[in-house]
From Swiss-Prot:
Gene that this sequence comes from: iolG
Function: Involved in the oxidation of myo-inositol (MI) to 2-keto-myo-inositol (2KMI or 2-inosose).
Pfam families documented for this protein: GFO_IDH_MocA, GFO_IDH_MocA_C3
Name of protein: Inositol 2-dehydrogenase
Organism: Mycolicibacterium smegmatis (strain ATCC 700084 / mc(2)155)
Disulfide bonds: none
Length: 345
């Protein structure tokens, strides 16, 4: 078939990065339409992509007859309306997290997709495509480590925008460890407890940073996560598996190591997620494009190759429990419907 024609909605930092990725590194696709609530930004991005045009209304962009599939990099509060429009138009969509900003609307999206009988929504949990995470998953599934027991995780950022608040550390940062836990362990998460250590004096006023998250699965596996988003250093993500027959670590800084001033050594730390997970994003998008093109060519009922709407709903449910725990200081049980109760979820 000819190249997949994609509309990218939202061309801020992440969306613009995806436009560049789709236009230069991903095979079998072209960016046909872009949209952003800052229209001058959309026009600037479109001008750099041959044949790309701006559509001012996001719902019109989704319905455009020259668009085969959609990438959502818009603000989270707009996702539910835009996802439902994609379902109405039966257009495959890669939605950056969150699926939606609350549990009820996320569940509604899952149910609406299931009613169609076609899997159209993929959620952008890119770590599943990172070569290190993928390798660890393969080794776990092959039984190389015996029984997995514990995950120790670190999630650090150099700084956050002025609009950031304490709950966003759960909803925007911890959400990735939530998906990693479910991906590696093939289990839902049963409970979350957010601890509040001594705040970083350098954090913006009113932000509880760092935070420690403790998550437990129904089988008793333990996950602890250090969340520290104002380190002033760089972007650091690490995951250590502790298991019956050994341990494994993801995210060690094993690039170039420089020895300079006598008695010191060091290397580079990724400045942000685009650098650390650039390869993961490339793999994610190439596989998504291939899945959508295959679905269109064959009339398949599945246009995804990665995290589904259910995974987005599960993450929303865990993060809601995390926000409740942050406020109350106690462990909170994760409340979810049974997946089996939704035929096709």
């Amino acid at each position: 078939m000819s190249d997949l024609r994609v509309a990218v909605l939202g061309v801020g930092v992440m969306g613009a990065d995806h436009v560049e990725r789709l236009s230069t590194r991903i095979a079998g696709v072209k960016v046909a339409v872009v949209n952003d609530f800052i229209e001058t930004r959309a026009e600037e991005i479109a001008a750099g992509v041959p044949g790309c045009r701006v559509v001012s209304d996001p719902l019109e962009a989704i319905a455009d007859p020259d668009v085969d599939a959609v990438v959502l990099a818009t603000p989270g509060p707009t996702h539910d309306k835009q996802l439902l429009a994609c379902l109405e138009q039966r257009k495959p969509v890669l939605c950056e997290k969150p699926l939606t900003t609350d549990v009820d609307s996320a569940l509604d999206v899952v149910r609406r997709e299931a009613e169609l009988g076609v899997r159209l929504i993929q959620v952008g949990f890119m770590r599943r495509f990172d070569p290190e995470y993928a390798e660890l998953k393969t080794l776990i599934d092959a039984g190389e480590f015996g029984q997995p027991l514990v995950l120790h995780c670190v999630h650090r950022n150099a700084a956050v925008p002025p609009s950031f608040d304490s709950t966003m550390i759960v909803k925007d940062s911890l959400v990735h460890e939530v998906d990693v836990t479910r991906f590696l362990f093939d289990e839902e998460i049963a409970s979350v407890h957010i601890l509040r250590p001594t705040p970083n004096p350098g954090a913006p006023e009113g932000i509880q940073d760092p935070q420690i998250a403790i998550m437990k699965t129904p089988s008793g596996k333990h996950v602890d996560v250090e969340l520290f988003v104002t380190t002033g250093v760089g972007y650091e993500v690490r995951t250590e598996l502790v298991a019956e027959k050994g341990t494994a670590m993801i995210g060690l800084d094993v690039g170039l190591i420089r020895k300079g001033v006598p008695g010191t050594w060091g290397g580079a730390i990724a400045p942000d997620f685009r650098v650390r997970f650039g390869t993961a994003y490339d793999i994610e998008f190439q596989r998504w494009v291939a899945a959508v093109r295959h679905g269109i060519a064959t009339g398949s009922d599945d246009y995804t190759d990665g995290p589904t709407a259910w995974d987005g709903y599960a993450a929303a449910a865990v993060c809601a429990a995390g926000v409740e725990s942050l406020a109350g200081g106690q462990p909170v049980e994760v409340k979810m419907v049974e997946r089996a109760s939704i035929n096709g979820a």
